[in-house]
Every structure is written in C-alpha cells, then in structure tokens.
Amino acid sequence: MTETKSITLPKAADSPGIGVPQDGTSSGAAGLSDASPLLVAAMTAGYEVVGSAPAGLPPGGAIGVASGISGPETEIVVGAIGNGEPAAAKPQKAKIRAKKTKPDAAGAKQAKHDLAEGKLAKHDVAEGKQAKPDMAVAKQAKHDMAGGKQAKPESLGAKEAQPETAGAKKAKTGTGGARETKPAGAKKLKAKSAKHAGAKLPAAKGGTPKDAASAARAAHPGKAGVKGARLKGGKLKIAKKGALKTAKGIALQPESPFDLSDSQWYLNRELTWLEFNRRVLHEAIDERTPLLERLKFVAIVSANIDEFIMKRIGGLKQQFGAGMHELTLDGRTPRQQVIECHTSIREIHARKREAFTEVRALLEQKGIVIESYATLIPKEKKFLREHYYANIYPLLTPQSIDPAHPFPFISNLSLNLLVTLRYPRAKEVSLARVKVPVGLGSPRFIRVGKGDHFIPLEDVMMNNLDMLFPGMHIVACEIFRVTRNANTEKDEEEADDLMAMIESELKERRFAPIVRLEIGSGMEPLHRGRLAAELELDEENDVFEVPGMLAMRDLFELARLDYPRMHDPAHHPIDHPQLLTTRNIFHTIRDARQILLQHPYVSFSTSIERFLREAANDPKVRGIKMTLYRTSSQSRIIEALLAAAQNGKQVAVVVELKARFDEATNIRLAEEMEEAGIHVTYGVVGLKTHCKVILVVRQDYSGLRRYVHIGTGNYHAETARIYSDVGLLTCDETIGQDATELFNYLTTGFMARRNYQALVPAPRLLKKALLARIEREMALHAAAGGGLIQFKMNALEDGDIVKALYRASMAGVRVDLYVRDTCRLRPGIPGLSENIRVVSIVGRFLEHARIYYFRNAGAEEYFISSADAMKRNLEARVEILCPVIAPELTRELRQIFDTYEADQRSAWDMRPDGSYVQRHPADGESGEGTHQMLIAQAERRLKESLKMKKKLPQR
C-alpha cells in the first residue's frame, strides 16, 4: 500500500522582522517564505514531480524544505506561497514520487537512506523543538505529532534556533544541486604540523582573488527572478504518520566526506593570534612604511605580546595547574598550547630584534640616535650624572636580597636591576634589587647632547650605581623583567557588591602569579636559577633570555617624535557631510532618518561627542541612556553626561566594570557619575556589557521621539583616531523601541521575554540569527545559485560558526571573510573550504569594525555589530547586531568590502595551513592600502557634498 504524507504551510504572519519596514514592503529580510525550491530540492534528492505545481506558485520562490521525506509517494500541500501573496482558500497539491535512481551529480542521497543511517540532524533535543531561523518558527515534526500543537508565527525577537547540543549528531551537509563535494582522488588530510595542528595542505594559489560579488551575480544570469527569502512564520504541520523525522529550512544535501569534528580542520586560537603579530611586525620591516611608523610597529608587537602573556598564557597555566586537560577544537591540551606559544613567541622576539636593529641604524642616518653610555663624551656623562642625582636618585629604593630580607615584591612589567656587590675587603658578595622608575612622568629615554640623541634610563642607572651604594664594589649589574597573570576574576554571582569585588580583584592582580621572566643576555646561570626559583617559574620554559633592549613597548616615546616625513601623511578626520552645519543635530537626524559614520575617517568629536553634547543642553531632551565599556580618562563623553544630569535630565549609564585593564578607570568614572546624580548600573550578572549604544529621548513636535547611536567601537576619543569602526545615528522607531528594551534588560537583569523587532542581541539571539542566515544562504544557493556571505570582523573563533561556514562552502556558497587576527578556519581545502577566502588587513589603523553581509538571493542584508564571531561574544556578553537598510548607507558598506578586495598593499591572503601571503600590486596597479583608499573616499564624499550645497538655491 502506498504511504502518503502531507505538509501544510498556512498563511504567513504579518509581523515584520529584522530589516522589514513597517509598511510590509520587502527589504530583503530574514528567511524562507516562498515555495518552489522544495520541488527543486526534492528532485535533487531523487524524487520525481508527477503533478502540476500549486496554483500561484512563483517560478523562483523559496520555502523551507522538509528534509528526510521517505516512502514511495509523498504529497506536498502548500498554503501561503509567493512573495507575501495570500494563500488560496483550498491549498493546491503537487505529488512527488520517489525514483529508483541514483542521486544527481550533487551527490544528494535519498532521505530514506539518511533515516536508515540515523544521520539526520536533531536540533533542540531537550525541548523537542525544530530550529527556528529568523522570524519563522516551525516546531519539529515529531514534537507536533505528539502534542498536536502548532507554532505561532513569531518575529525575530522570539526564540530562534538553539545551537546544537554536545550530544546531538550533526547533519551531514554538502552541495545541493551542484558538483560532488569530494574531488576526484582527494584523500583525507592528516595532521602533520605541530605548530598549526593541521594537515599537509596545498599551498595557496597565486594571484589576486576575483571579486566575489561580481562572480556571484554572474554565476546564474538566468535566475535573476529569484527574490530574497523572508521568514514570515509559515507553520509546518505533519498530516500523517510516517518516517518523517525532521523538517529543516534548507535544501536536501549530500552526505559530507569530511568529519567536521576532526581536529585537523581547525587552527588554534592562540597560535593564529600570534600569527597576526607576525603580520604586524612585517610593517616594521616593510620599506614602504615610514621610518618612525616602523619603530611604532616594533613597540606595538612588544605591547601585544606582553598582553598576550598576561591574559592568554596566564589563563592556560591556570588551567593545567588546576589539572584541566580538556582538548581544544584543534586537539590541544592547555600545556601543549603554552609550549607551542612559547616557541612562537621566541621566534617573534628574534625577528623583532632584527627589525629594531635595522630601524635603529636607519634612524641614526636621520639624526635620531639611541646612544650607549660607553660612546658618550665626558661632557655628556657629566650632564647625565647631574640629571641622575637630581631627577632619578630620589626615586630609587634599593632592596637587599639575603636571609635577613625576604625576596622583594616585583611589580608587573617593571624593569629591574639585579646588582651584585661586596665590601672592598670582603670575599662574599651580596645581591640587591633596584627598580627602574619608568612611568608617572619619568621617561624611558633621556635626551642627551644636542639634537635627538637619547639614552635608556637603565643605562644611566647602571653607570652611576656608586652613588646608590657608596663605598661598595660593584661586581656586576644585570637586568630583568617579570610578567604577571591578569586572570584574577571571581564569581560575581557570589558578590554582594560588584564594585567592591572588582576593586578586590585589582589588588589581587598586583600580586598575581608570575608567568614570565625576561632577563638580559649574559646573566649568571646562578642568578638566573635563583630568580626562577624565587618567582616559582620553570627555568627551562618560563625564562626568556633577551639580547639587547627589554621592554621595547617603551619605544612609543621615540615613535612620537615630530618628523613629518618619517610618519604617515597627516590625517585629519572630516566632518560628516550631513553634519557640517550648526543646525540642531536631532533635526538633521530626523530628516536623514539614518546616518552612517566611518571612523577614523569621520570625526568622532563632531559626530558622537556632538550628539551627546547637544543632548545634554537641548531643553527638549528628556533622557539619555548609554553603555560604557572603555573611554578616555579625560573624556568629553563623561563631561556631557555630567552636564546633562546638572541640567535636570534623566541620565542612566551602564558601566562595564570588568573591561580588562580599564577597571580602575571605569570604577573612578562610575563613582564620579553617581556623585553627580546619574543612575549608574553595572550590567547583567555573569555577562560583560560589550555593546555600544546611546539612546536619547526627545520631545519632538509629534511627541516623544527616540534617537539612537549604535557602533562597533568604544566611546573613546583617542582610539577613535586610530581604530577603524562604523556606527549608525538613527531615529528609526523600531530600532528605538528595541534600544529601550535593551536598556530595560541591562538595568534590571530580568530575563523576561522581550520582543526585538530590528536589533538582535547576544547572548540570546545573535548566534542563532547568524547560523540561521548561513543555512538560509545555502538553501537559496541550492535553488538559484549565486550564494554569497561576507563577514568583516576581528576574530573568527566560535566552532559552530566555523562549521556552518564549512557547510556553506561545501554547498557551493561563496564565503569571503575579512578577519583581522584569530581565525580557526582553514580556507581553500578542496571539497571542504574551496569556496572560502580569508583576508587580513594590517595597516595604518587597527581594523575594528564588524560587518555581516548575506546576498539573500539579491535582497541583500547588511548588519553592523559590536560582536566578533567568538564564543565569548556570542554566549557570554551582551552584544548587538543592527541592520543597515537605507540604500545610500548599504552602498557605503559595499564600498568598504570592495575596497578590501581591491587592496594590494595591506591585504594578506590566508593559506590552508594557517600561514599568510601579502598581496603586492602588479605593474600599473595602485599601491594604496585600504586605509589610504578609505581616507580618499571620505574626502571625496565631502567635496561632492559641498559642491551639491553650492548648487542649491540660497534661502
């Protein structure tokens, strides 16, 4: 007897979702609502259409596909179909009969085989719910059959697809309707490189990759009629018992030849971050970089490695010290990671010394000299001795190291002299420690003689120790430096007072375990061993002997010297073309609806600071709310908030006290604001508040109106000049409502169900939204081709996102990733990631913006976010994903991606083994990097705007 099953999708819900205007018009929003790819995918899987398509079915529609259909004959009943058209009164039917033939070239297997093998995905096992991408919520078939319930259409703010549980088996996916995912003769790659935990992988192909967007548009010219899918709450109902196990909003796909749980497909987070520092160090070597900028990059790498040792190595040592041996996604234990990181750090240090030696010699030719004490003339030595006695000697505190005196406390990152001395007639020697007083107004480099000649402070001290130890014989003087663990966080759920707990952590951090000892070359082995023992370090692994200068991060002092020709060309951020006038900024935003800000190309002062300054003084402004993660110590942002409170406005600030290395500043600012009457809260217990949001409520002519700023970067005037970020000024009603919901959550911590219509917050929804959109792009690509995903972020570390991108590549979707530093994904592996490119931009500014793009069958979606694709951002922080819809703004974001693609100066292409190769301009090509091009684009937009204003009639 023939077994028959039906799937019914009733009329779609009317509630708009992310990126959907309130008037119901399509803007390329979020999901799947049309119908014909169901038939396409079923035929791909080996089914034959024997009836006519449902009445009203558009030729290029798309709906979720019921994967796992089995049985000799299946009926598919389609209700709401088309692009928002109402459903027919009586649903039409299309019959599909399974063929006894092999799958097509895509390698898609029949669902019956999938069921027999038990390899269908099981999402939300605990709750028995089907994944709910975007706005459409379809309960799992098995759950519906058991309970007889039907899911109500929900907006994006409702619950979305839960990430796969650890025990759930992953769905085997591949290329639907395309070529075989496993190339002919391809063999499973075996892990070989201990450094990168990877396989012996093919080298990256030469040449510059083609424009992905153009390639995607050209891929299927005959299918331009396929419109972007939208999730509008279609309800999935299983009308008959049978073997249908799951219903997913993706096309049927072949079984993957790659085991995505295999560690060889993933790179190590720590090692890829260190690889990023090799690219930064290359800027110090590159002769195209101005000389003092090269010195700056030496200092940057030194500071980066210091912070890495404090945060990452310190944390890893805590793990294996506590007996933790859990493997990472790439198959390493904490101890293995520390050992390999130390090896990489030693290599970077060696290369850094070579770079510094070269730059130092070139600077000498320009008259900037770092002297050694031995080369000074007597007159200069006399000057330095007098300077030492007057300005350094009073700050010194020598400490003896002997049985009568305990080993002294050594502060984090401090330079220290270990002095060996004895009395003139004594044979025994004694040891003393002297801290080099760098900081708090004391420079590391002292100017000597005429011109720009400098000598390190420690050199001056070493050669004038007789003043500090009169009557003693100085036997030797050696230098060392320590680095302490910065991971001292406590469980804030157990704290009665969060601020008091953070203050306690700061005190403990001063005395945290030491994780690295750096010593100058030539230190006595006995002294080296004694220091390691006193500091409780492994002498073999934790002690770094450094030839030459220690603490090269202090070279920032010299890199700031005023030599314009040895710096990058001066850059002065422009005023945004729409913010040039002195007109009330709220009137400007109201007329423009949305304004996109690109920092540092657009002035932070005349945009964001002005926004807050005018809000503080505008009599029509009723309230101001904002999040504060990092800001400068003398901040105009804080001044504006204090002024607003003094002017009687309601001001609420969510201060993140746990912003690493900014805790003390944030505590001081929080106390200052509380004293001024500002409502200060510290976010949600257990989560860091990392989103960047300002909400201003103003009494407009039509009632209260909400004005919002959402950004990817901190409200920090200094970093806004050197970090590349984007932000959005808007008075969009939906975004304003969502911002209000967000602040209600942040100021109370209540986990009540909140209905977000435009914004997508983490940790509840953001990761699910990204995964759902990746799956949707796969489904649309299977139906019509031309799939394209582009992400711009600082780091790609989350395992679920990486696996989803692998599946997208195997399905034929083009994936362009612009990732600044950490990237766990291996691009360019045939059959697995051959459709993925990873590019890192390293140049004048620090890339910091997060932009997410989905082609969505032509109804493109753009988002900006405070979140990277990292587990901590997506699951342990409060973040925001914000849609950018206005065509004039999406054109700007598209121009950013196109600029990255055109970069032949500061772009690095990632190879499958985790290494990178820098692009170089061919003959006749521009040698400008991304940042130079974006500066020129911003200035060009300003000039065009000024020309247009001159043409307008004067009022």
Regions of interest found by a model, annotated:
Residues I801:
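Polyanion-binding catalytic cores of nucleic-acid enzymes and NTP/SAM-utilizing transferases
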Residues A42, T74-E75, N83, K109, ...:
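Positively charged, lysine/arginine-rich intrinsically disordered segments
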Residues P91-I96, K100-A213, A218-I238:
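Long, intrinsically disordered low-complexity tandem-repeat regions enriched in serine/threonine/proline
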Residues T2-G24, G28-G51, G64-G68, E73-G79, ...:
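N-terminal localization/anchoring segments of enzymes in phospholipid and broader phosphate metabolism
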Residues R814-Y818:
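Hydrophobic alpha/beta core scaffold segments
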